[in-house]
Amino acid sequence: MSREIKRTSQFKKDVKRMLRQGRQLEPLLDVVEKLQNDIPLPSELRDHPLVGNWHGKRECHIEPDWLLIYEKTDSVLLLTLIRTGTHSGIPGL
């Protein structure tokens, strides 16, 4: 069973910004599909838990300088897409 996807308003703004920068959405959509269906991500995406202000969230690399911050909630099978962007474009990373 796949997870329901919730997109934060900031994530939606981030996606628009990435499109304006000329990024293609296919790599992001591929990763989101894997996460939604609980398919393990390839090691080159460097999926890892975050600490500090981002504790409880996870980050993976869509491309070398394109990140996705997300959270999985197992009790309700929810995938929350929190932020996407570059290292310098996401405060606090």
Model-derived features: where do they sit?
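A short, surface-exposed loop/turn module that caps and links secondary-structure elements
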Residues: 34-61
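PIN-domain endoribonuclease scaffold, especially VapC-family toxins
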Residues: 25-37
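Enriched for short, Lys/Arg-rich terminal
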Residues: 1-4, 12-25, 60-67, 71-93
